[in-house]
From Swiss-Prot:
The chain crosses the membrane at residues 216-232. It comes from the Eukaryota. Keywords: Coiled coil, Membrane, Phosphoprotein, Transmembrane, Transmembrane helix, Transport, Ubl conjugation. It comes from Homo sapiens (Human). One of its GO terms (biological process) is vesicle fusion. This is Syntaxin-8. Belongs to the syntaxin family. Vesicle trafficking protein that functions in the early secretory pathway, possibly by mediating retrograde transport from cis-Golgi membranes to the ER. The lineage of its organism: Eukaryota, Metazoa, Chordata, Craniata, Vertebrata.
Length: 236
C-alpha cells in the first residue's frame, strides 16, 4: 500500500521541528560562552522557513483530502489537531529563536520522538473513538484505507445494481415496443378485414338489386307472352 503523502509530510515536518530545537539549543550554548554562531543562525532561519512551507503544504493536502472525501470527517479532525500542534510548535520555536519565549530545552522536551509519535495517543484529541485508541499512525492509515476500500466496494455494488436495473428497464421498454408493434399489426388487420366486409356487403346488395330486377323482367316477359297468346287465340 502506498504511504499517505500527508503523514509522510507530517513526519518530515516533525523532524524539522526537532532539528530546529536542537540547533537553537546549540546556538544558545555558544552565546552563553560569549561566542557567535552565524552559520547556525543562518541554518536555523532556513529550517524555520522550510518548516513554514511544510506546514502550509500540510494544510493544502488536508483541505484537498477532506474536500474530495478521501478521508472521513473524523480523520480530518484528527489531522487538523496534529496540524494545530505543529503550528503551536512553530510559534514556540520562532519565539525561542528570537529569545522571546520558552527555553529550547523545554521546547525540545515537548517535541514527540518518532517512537512516541507513532505509539502514544495524541493528547490534543478529545473523545477518541475506541476503534483507534492506542493505535499508531500506520495502523490508523491502514484502518482508514480499509474503510475507504469497503466504501468503494459498496459503491461498486450499488453501481452494479443500478446498471442491472437500467438494463431491465431497457429490456422492458423493448418488450413494450414489440407489444405495441403487435397491437398495431392487429389494428391494421382488423381495419383491412372491416374494409373487406364492407366491400362484400356492397357486392351482396348489388346482387340483390340485380336479382330483383331480373324477377321483374321475367314477370313482364310472361305478361307480354300471355297478351300475345290471348290476342292470337282464335275465337268462335
Amino acid at each position: 500500500m502506498a504511504p499517505d503523502p500527508w503523514f509522510s509530510t507530517y513526519d518530515s515536518t516533525c523532524q524539522i521541528a526537532q532539528e530546529i530545537a536542537e540547533k537553537i539549543q546549540q546556538r544558545n550554548q555558544y552565546e552563553r560562552k560569549g561566542e557567535k554562531a552565524p552559520k547556525l543562525t543562518v541554518t536555523i532561519r532556513a529550517l524555520l522557513q522550510n518548516l513554514k512551507e511544510k506546514i502550509a503544504l500540510l494544510k493544502d493536502l488536508l483541505l484537498r483530502a477532506v474536500s474530495t472525501h478521501q478521508i472521513t470527517q473524523l480523520e480530518g479532525d484528527r489531522r487538523q489537531n496534529l496540524l494545530d500542534d505543529l503550528v503551536t510548535r512553530e510559534r514556540l520555536l520562532l519565539a525561542s529563536f528570537k529569545n522571546e519565549g520558552a527555553e529550547p530545552d523545554l521546547i525540545r522536551s515537548s517535541l514527540m520522538s518518532e517512537e512516541a509519535k507513532r505509539g502514544a495517543p495524541n493528547p490534543w484529541l478529545f473523545e477518541e473513538p475506541e476503534e483507534t485508541r492506542g493505535l499508531g499512525f500506520d495502523e490508523i492509515r491502514q484502518q482508514q484505507q480499509k474503510i475507504i476500500q469497503e466504501q468503494d466496494a459498496g459503491l461498486d455494488a450499488l453501481s452494479s445494481i443500478i446498471s442491472r436495473q437500467k438494463q431491465m428497464g431497457q429490456e422492458i421498454g423493448n418488450e413494450l415496443d414489440e407489444q405495441n408493434e403487435i397491437i398495431d399489426d392487429l389494428a391494421n388487420l382488423v381495419e383491412n378485414t372491416d374494409e373487406k366486409l364492407r366491400n362484400e356487403t356492397r357486392r351482396v346488395n348489388m346482387v340483390d338489386r340485380k336479382s330483383a330486377s331480373c324477377g321483374m323482367i321475367m314477370v313482364i316477359l310472361l305478361l307480354l307472352v300471355a297478351i300475345v297468346v290471348v290476342a292470337v287465340w282464335p275465337t268462335n
